[in-house]
């Protein structure tokens, strides 16, 4: 559903290179936020065993700031894409909120939906179940 609405938005602005560039940049912000969360979570475990005291705190604070910055960009991207969708008369596909948790969940959802493009799943749950089974088979092989 998100992808369909996104494609309608892009089609509406097909002749406006500047707007298309803005849309492309906004869409990049969602997987970038997901990547920042992933990076922070994986690096924190390493930082926790390698550093103590102030050095540990500084490194974790730096990771958290990068994640927060990416989150703010994603929130701004949602607002901009919703304004463009309204202008185009197409259904908005971003949440209309400043709630950090909602926008964070949206970033994961939209990234998953585009990742699953071309695969025939009826739901995100089905996609995740299938992905877990696929990875499990590869790990135990």
Task: Name these PLM-found stretches.
Residues 35-124:
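Acidic, low-complexity, intrinsically disordered interaction modules
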Residues 9-32:
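Short, charge/polar-rich alpha-helical segments
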Residues 14, 86, 114, 129-132:
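Intrinsic disorder/low-complexity segments in short proteins, especially the signal peptide
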Residues 8-9, 26, 102, 110:
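N-terminal leader/targeting signatures
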Residues 1-8, 129-141:
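Short intrinsically disordered terminal tails
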Residues 10-11, 111-112, 141:
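N-terminal leader/targeting segments
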């Amino acid at each position: 559903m998100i992808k369909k609405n996104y494609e309608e938005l892009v089609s509406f602005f097909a002749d406006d290179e500047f707007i298309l560039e803005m849309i492309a940049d906004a869409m990049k912000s969602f997987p970038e936020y997901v990547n920042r969360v992933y990076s922070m979570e994986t690096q924190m475990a390493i930082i926790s065993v390698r550093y103590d005291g102030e050095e540990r705190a500084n490194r974790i604070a730096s990771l958290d700031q990068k994640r927060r910055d990416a989150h703010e960009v994603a929130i701004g991207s949602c607002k901009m894409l919703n304004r463009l969708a309204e202008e185009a008369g197409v259904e908005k596909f971003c949440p209309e909120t400043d709630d950090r948790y909602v926008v964070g969940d949206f970033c994961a959802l939209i990234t998953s939906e585009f990742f699953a493009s071309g695969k025939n799943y009826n739901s995100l749950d089905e996609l995740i179940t299938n992905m877990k089974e696929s990875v499990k088979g590869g790990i135990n092989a």
